[in-house]
């Protein structure tokens, strides 16, 4: 009898401890799973909630096909920039130059249109891609801080846009009838081409991030660059490509803005880099890098533009209210991300 009580066989005291450990493990796993889902889909949940509430409050003024198409069109320009920013932030970087690149692209597109549609398209994309490439080389090869490099190119690109437009006093116009205007004013099946182009870029970005070695490398570098180096990943090449893509997409957004308005102004795009960063982070991408998604960025972009649309529906609120709301959202999201990350580590 004493042997049965003191042994480790059946009926011994070890069994309840093992069961308790299994239960705790299951609870922890469930908590991690819920935290992960909230981190990835939080922006989508908030977006759906805002759309439902706005539809109830404003009725057909908000919940109409025309209004939703307007929201999509307004989202397309920011969305293009945000896709590039998603890769940069997941890769552990930051790009402050995109707003100025958009303005420079719009000015160059309108300026180049006097030489034909081909120049109007090629010139802004080439220049913005070149500046993005310069960002990547200085950051990856010269090992300069991304904040400093892209801040410098922010100033450079904005200054160049003002120089081309005679210190902002000259606004270049695209002549009606040029093929380039179709990029901003044309439509496909009733949907504006900027929306179609942005959708294609989002799809390509999603495939690149989730279905390619390049996307795996970007995530690995942003998560732990030293470990990525030990894995033999081409860190410098991946980083250069990230900033090149960001520059090209900012240039594409500026080109579409110019084609949409048939003009290029050096004053547009101020603060766009902050809106893009906010959309990316609100969409669940960690500002510290290593985790994020294109789908989340899409939800973040749409959420910001839906909020802006709701503010316009109210009519009595200023345009700056959207910036206040975006700032509050950003702080809340970052706090939630920190909490969820801690939950996943427990």
Per-range role (PLM):
Residues 115-118, 122-124, 130-135, 139, ...:
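Helix-loop-helix "hairpin" substructures at the membrane interface of multi-pass membrane proteins
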